[in-house]
Amino acid sequence: RCRSKKIICNYHGRRFDDEGKFEFMPEFKETINFPRKSDNLHDFPLFVWHNLIFVGLNPSFSIEKVFEKINERISFLPLQNLKLDKKLSKDYSIDANWALYCDNYLEGFHVPFVHKDLNEVLDYNNYDTEIDEYFNLQIGYAKNKDECFQIPKDHKDFGKNIAAYYYWLFPNLMLN
């Protein structure tokens, strides 16, 4: 739902109500057959998960159902408190096909050679992959208990030394 009473296009001056219904455009008062229903803003499915907003232009599956399953696994994490820390953030600009990037994210054979810090934490010989209809989950286990999540007793992963959950949602969203 829009928080403003009006939506105004700064480029054309078109004005819409808070539901996206066309109201006005400068210099078009006398135009025949204007406005039409097609001049209203389109309605797109919107889903908010913590501080992330997802819009489906033509969704073929329910993102809400996908995140319900993800929440079953990681709801114990205080995701609502996450804030960007620029000191811990790294940006990489790469010239690669998106599918190749996804493939790189999903295969872990390169970790010992490319991600030295991560390789010190993860037990390379202990790794699980779970496949769902629209996402997969890779679970990285820690070499020692100091590097793992504090998992609640009633959780399916309680007692496991899990250092990372790597989610890949079809076609190109990665969460870890």
Task: Describe each region flagged by the PLM.
Residues R1-N58:
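Rieske [2Fe-2S] iron-sulfur-binding domain
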Residues P45-V48, L52-N176:
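C-terminal catalytic domain of Rieske-type non-heme iron oxygenases
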